[in-house]
Design a protein with these regions (language model features):
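N-terminal lobe of the biotin/lipoate ligase/transferase fold
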Residues: 1-101
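Structural motif
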Residues: 13, 39-41, 66, 108, ...
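Short, glycine/acidic-enriched loop or turn micro-motifs at the edges of active sites
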Residues: 21, 48, 117, 145-147
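Short beta-strand segments
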Residues: 43-45, 69, 110, 126-128, ...
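Short glycine- and Lys/Arg-enriched binding-loop motifs that mark or flank ligand-binding interfaces
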Residues: 46-51, 115, 138-140
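Short coil/turn motifs at secondary-structure junctions
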Residues: 73-75, 130-132, 148-150
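Acidic (Asp/Glu) carboxylate-rich active-site/surface patches
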Residues: 92-134, 144
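Short, acidic (Asp/Glu-rich) active-site segment that either coordinates a divalent metal cofactor
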Residues: 134-153
């Protein structure tokens, strides 16, 4: 079982796992079981089968990566699918600005979801949603950043 954070981050419910197959998969399991609430965040030290784009696996080692997924409930927002256009790129731009502001590191974006540093892939963003009758029911945003990863599959 995960450790549940004792404090919330602006209303986020945070669950931390030492090891998990995938933070994204855990969000979807909770969604399927109807045990998830808006602004639920799943964080893991180690992912054994993290999800990348195009069915790729996103590997994470302990203390060498940042891996988390966040669930947003849109069921009461009447949000059309087209309103999510560009969401992944906006998230990527925000990550780039955070790294610049906090660490004075210049990062690049490889459209639409990859983050690069000095020509090497540093991380990525996976945005998934459930849509019903043209309206977004929920959005799950997964972010993986390699901070000190040495070995890659």
């Amino acid at each position: 079982m995960p450790k549940e954070s004792l404090r919330n981050l602006d209303g986020f419910k945070i669950f931390h796992y030492k090891t998990i197959d995938s933070t994204q998969k855990e969000i979807w399991r909770r969604f399927k079981n109807k045990t998830i609430k808006d602004k639920t965040m799943i964080i893991a030290d180690i992912q054994t089968a993290g999800i990348g784009t195009h069915g790729r696996i996103w590997h994470t080692d302990e203390e060498n990566n940042i891996a988390f997924s966040v669930y947003f409930d849109f069921s009461k927002k009447n949000c059309r699918v087209d309103e999510l256009d560009g969401l992944t790129v906006r998230i990527a731009k925000k990550i780039v600005s955070i790294f610049k502001e906090m660490y004075d590191i210049d990062l690049d974006i490889k459209f639409p979801n990859d983050i690069y540093c000095n020509g090497k892939k540093l991380g990525g963003i996976l945005t998934e949603s459930k849509v019903q009758n043209g309206l977004v029911r929920c959005v799950v945003i997964g972010i993986g950043i390699n901070t000190n990863q040495v070995e890659f599959a």
